[in-house]
Amino acid sequence: MNCLKKNEHSARRCTQINHRCLSVCIGGRFSKPNFCHGLVYNRSTHTGVMSQFHSVTFVDIETAAKLLADIAHRTPVMTSTTVNQHTNSQVFFKCENFQRTGSFKFRGAYNALLQLSADQKQKGVITFSSGNHAQAIALAGSLLNIPTTIVIPDDAPTVKRSATRGYGAEVILYDRSETYREELTQTLAQDRGLTIIPPYDHPHIVAGQGTAAKELVEEVSGLDLLLVCCGGGGLLSGSAIAAKALSPNCKVIGVEPERADDATRSFHTKTLHTVNNPDTIADGARTPSLGKITFPLVLNYVDDMVTVSEEAIVRTMFFLWERLKIVVEPTGVLAAAALLEGVINEPDAKIGVIISGGNVDLSQVAQLFTSS
């Protein structure tokens, strides 16, 4: 089964593949992820999903933090008097838009690449991403002298594609509407002997992402609530593990776009739901579903899931650009939008909000702000 030649830089759906449940290499091991409806998780007995994988713990996050200490930025925590007055709370923004490559993704990417064997590092890695994980893997690979190949949708923001190439990665574009990225990535990995580092469903990725919340909770003691955006659930699950370990009474709420609400539905029904190619400006949240690792972690550690509208995302972007003077992308403001738009109402509370990234095309921002 070969969907394309090794050096072909465009892709179309392989007609030989008539299903989506392929084996995917995760850190050198093969498993069979579920991309379909109907995966039920029993929270009380931990049956099914979690038993097949390494269960990520706070110890893993602490280990990742030590490995990242001199590599990743310890990003700033910002406050706003206007936001505090508007919400009648103390709000603390953890600004991962100031992280290397412009998003939290660098934390997990570097941590995951460090764990590879010498042979895996020599052969190289491959991943699929809408842009932020792509840049993170590309930079981490460059720093560690590991060849990187990135499968990116052709509608990903230009700034993300350009930066990924700039970090030295080979970029392969595909059409979201015609190609299953997991299948394309798997085929390339098999042809070239590469190790797949998925964008969220990987224990070392989750552990690395959790270091952002670890820093926030350690810096701002006594948080009552932590708001985190959710795409595939890597940042959300890692953040929840860290928050519950350091501040057990802190509630953790994940936030998605209304148009990409697979995780919210999965959380409330305890059944894994899929939304393919959701039409949302939050490109980092266009993942079809939570993963086999992140789904049970979200169920175990997260207290609630909510959604925000496209209009709320744009208004929040504008507000943060105008008042905090920071560049933020649509996905990056999901958590903030839930608070500022009143989806979450927690007066007299200490609230942490993770701003996940700031990689956005200026032309896109101009169009969004003008149209709103």
Residue ranges and their predicted role:
Residues 50-372:
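PLP-dependent amino-acid enzyme catalytic core
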Residues 17-20, 30, 44, 117, ...:
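Hydrophobic alpha-helical membrane context
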Residues 5-8, 21, 31, 65, ...:
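N-terminal hydrophobic alpha-helix used for membrane targeting or insertion
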Residues 1-27, 35-50:
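Short, low-complexity, charge-dense intrinsically disordered segments
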